[in-house]
Amino acid sequence: MRPHRGVLLDTHVLLWFLAGAPQVSARLIRVIDSGVAVFFSPLSIAEAALKARLGKITAPPDLALRLHDLGFQELPLTSAPATAITRFPGLDHHDPFDRLLLAQALESSLWFETADKTILALGLPEVRDAQA
């Protein structure tokens, strides 16, 4: 396994963090405050915008700007994660945004912080529970 160079936050974790929601664990807040490189994906911006438009969630229209203002780095999206999603057979019928975000984190040697029980159940060592 390659060394990890930072952390990628799942879309719901980004939104929770921005809102100061109690779902974000003290451990994750310490990680973010420690100065480790924190990344967000353009996939999260698209997912939040789409779900907000459909009325499923509330997300700020300037989400990317707010994340940049916090010092979070935008992780470039390449074709590698798009093909790597086949490495997770347990997610074949899961949300494609989630599969791509997970693949993007792993392909980029990042920890992936999520509260998605299906992803956490995969037992991947690079995946951390954002609520624990």
For every predicted segment, state its role.
Residues 1-40, 54-65, 108, 121-122, ...:
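Short, well-structured N-terminal submotif of metal-dependent ribonuclease cores
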Residues 2, 60-61, 72-117, 125, ...:
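Active-site neighborhoods of divalent-metal-dependent phosphate/nucleic-acid chemistry enzymes
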Residues 14, 45, 82, 119-120:
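A generic structural signal for short hydrophobic patches within well-formed alpha-helices
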Residues 51:
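ABC-type ATPase nucleotide-binding domain
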